[in-house]
Swiss-Prot record:
Subunit: Heterodimer with MEIS1. Interacts with IPO7; the interaction facilitates nuclear translocation of DLX3 in dental papilla cells.
Keyword Zinc-finger belongs to the record: no
Job description of the protein: Transcriptional activator. Activates transcription of GNRHR, via binding to the downstream activin regulatory element (DARE) in the gene promoter.
Spans annotated as Interaction with DNA: 131-181
DNA-binding residues: 129-188
Keyword Transcription: yes
The protein's name: Homeobox protein DLX-3
Species: Homo sapiens (Human)
TM helices/strands, residue ranges: none
GO CC terms, sorted: chromatin; cytoplasm; nucleus
Length: 287
């Protein structure tokens, strides 16, 4: 009785020792024993770098894993933070200065605004106030007049040069030439301007044409008209009833009938170089 009990006790002890030895070696074994599947404490223990201190079944933050390599020797071993700056190579970093530099402030485009004419109310009606008239000195007027006699129209460089010489603006020179041309046209139209002050070849109004002679100076430029008095006057047609009543009486028929009578007529004067066809003969002389 005692011998069988001792054998059973020894077998139970060997089973317990074998089970304990299996649990102790399961940590180093690559395979898990069947009894460890239901053991929840196994998963809570630190087993890998990715799940250190993390319970099983929780979401893993992608920025908390450890990396074991360096990028171009610039980053050390450690955990990534969500807002950390990535380490790019030197070829990419040289373009970072263009992104970080602020854009230069552009100057606003200056637009010249013409001053508006002052408007005053006169008798309840708006009326623009005229600008004061430009007062030219005697030297400026003499220089402008001399230049106007040379050419009534100025090109842009010539106008700028003349304005700089006289101390005027280009607008003042342009307005003076416009007023002077209108005054000259009015005087020239009324005949108060002599012929030598007419527009010359340099003026675009002249169109490079010679000046026309005056109306009172036609004796030197007149040409003799051809003397038409030397031609004999044409003979009038006869309105005899025999010529009007007979429609078949033509010029050729009358010429054949009045051959002897036409020979008795005096010949044409010899002063004529070009023989012109004479009028038809008088049919009234033929009976």
């Amino acid at each position: 009785m005692s011998g069988s009990f001792d054998r059973k006790l020894s077998s139970i002890l060997t089973d317990i020792s074998s089970s304990l030895s299996c649990h102790a070696g399961s940590k180093d074994s690559p395979t898990l024993p069947e009894s460890s599947v239901t053991d929840l404490g196994y998963y809570s223990a630190p087993q890998h770098d990715y799940y250190s201190g993390q319970p099983y079944g929780q979401t893993v933050n992608p920025y908390t894993y450890h990396h074991q390599f360096n990028l171009n020797g610039l980053a050390g071993t450690g955990a990534y933070s969500p807002k950390s700056e990535y380490t790019y190579g030197a070829s990419y970093r040289q373009y970072g200065a263009y992104r970080e530099q602020p854009l230069p402030a552009q100057d606003p485009v200056s637009v010249k605004e013409e001053p508006e004419a002052e408007v005053r109310m006169v008798n309840g009606k708006p009326k623009k106030v005229r600008k004061p008239r430009t007062i030219y000195s005697s030297y400026q007027l003499a220089a402008l007049q001399r230049r106007f006699q040379k050419a009534q129209y100025l090109a842009l460089p010539e106008r700028a040069e003349l304005a700089a010489q006289l101390g005027l603006t280009q607008t003042q020179v342009k307005i003076w030439f416009q007023n002077r041309r209108s005054k000259f046209k009015k005087l020239y139209k009324n005949g108060e301007v002599p012929l030598e002050h007419s527009p010359n070849n340099s003026d675009s109004m002249a169109c490079n044409s010679p000046p026309s002679p005056a109306l009172w100076d036609t004796s030197s430029h007149s040409t003799p008209a051809p003397a038409r008095s030397q031609l004999p006057p044409p003979l009038p047609y006869s309105a005899s009833p025999s010529y009007l009543d007979d429609p078949t009486n033509s010029w050729y028929h009358a010429q054949n009938l009045s051959g002897p009578h036409l020979q008795q007529q005096p010949p044409q004067p010899a002063t004529l170089h070009h023989a012109s066809p004479g009028p038809p003969p008088n049919p009234g002389a033929v009976y």
